[in-house]
């Protein structure tokens, strides 16, 4: 994948005392898993070793490169989602600890790295909720549509379609449903503005 990096190469260059850099890497991982799950893909071996990273604006975009254990379904059950998240948490923790040991970092750092791996699940759940929420608001609060779209764009998602539907028992209340595209909003926007690929 042109312009991408393996996580080990990135990790070896990141200052160990600045977790914000690792957080960007792990946010990309959470975004990738959300994308796969939205499309009915159970990864089965979500790990940093099976992932490449590229830049998308200020975000790191993650790409699946090892799909031997993946399965494609029309949609995933809560059990499948939870199982894939558990696999990811364990594999990411191991994937962070291994290069830390190679760099000779103190063993006390393992706890921090494990906590960072566990935080990927929180990021995943936040993204999942943002994509699947169907907020209800008053007819006069239509500005919230723009706020919802802007929030999804900030998370890196292009919004393909917005549907407003009255809540059945109160026509002054609207439910917003948003259909989002892939998580490449920033890269697409740069291409539109510059004409560069």
Place the predicted regions along the sequence by residue.
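Conserved structural core of kinase catalytic domains
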Residues: 1-26, 62
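Alpha-helical structural motif
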Residues: 3, 81-84, 88, 116, ...
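Conserved kinase catalytic-core helix
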Residues: 14-44, 48
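Short, polar/flexible loop-turn hinges at active-site or ligand-entry regions and domain interfaces
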Residues: 17-18, 71, 99-103
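Hydrophobic, Leu/Ile/Phe/Ala-enriched alpha-helical segments that form helix-helix packing faces
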Residues: 33-40, 92, 96, 124
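Catalytic activation segment of kinase domains across protein kinase-like and atypical kinase folds
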Residues: 42, 48-98
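Regulatory N- and C-terminal appendages and interdomain linkers associated
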Residues: 98-197
């Amino acid at each position: 994948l042109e312009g991408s990096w393996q996580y080990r190469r990135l990790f070896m260059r990141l200052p160990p005392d600045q977790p914000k850099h690792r957080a960007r890497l792990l946010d990309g991982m959470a975004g990738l898993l959300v994308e796969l799950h939205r499309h009915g893909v159970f990864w089965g071996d979500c790990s940093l070793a099976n992932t490449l990273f590229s830049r998308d604006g200020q975000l790191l975009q993650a790409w699946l490169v090892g799909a031997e254990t993946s399965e494609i379904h029309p949609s995933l059950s809560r059990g499948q989602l939870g199982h894939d998240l558990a696999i990811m948490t364990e594999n990411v923790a191991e994937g962070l600890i291994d290069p830390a040991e190679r760099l000779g970092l103190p063993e006390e750092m393992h706890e921090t790295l494990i906590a960072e791996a566990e935080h990927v699940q929180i990021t995943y759940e936040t993204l999942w909720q943002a994509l699947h929420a169907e907020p209800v608001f008053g007819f006069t609060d239509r500005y919230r549509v723009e706020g919802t779209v802007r929030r999804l764009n900030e998370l890196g998602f292009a919004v393909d379609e917005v549907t407003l539907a009255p809540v059945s028992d109160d026509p002054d209340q609207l439910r917003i449903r948003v259909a989002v595209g892939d998580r490449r909003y920033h890269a697409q926007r740069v291409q539109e503005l510059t004409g560069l690929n």
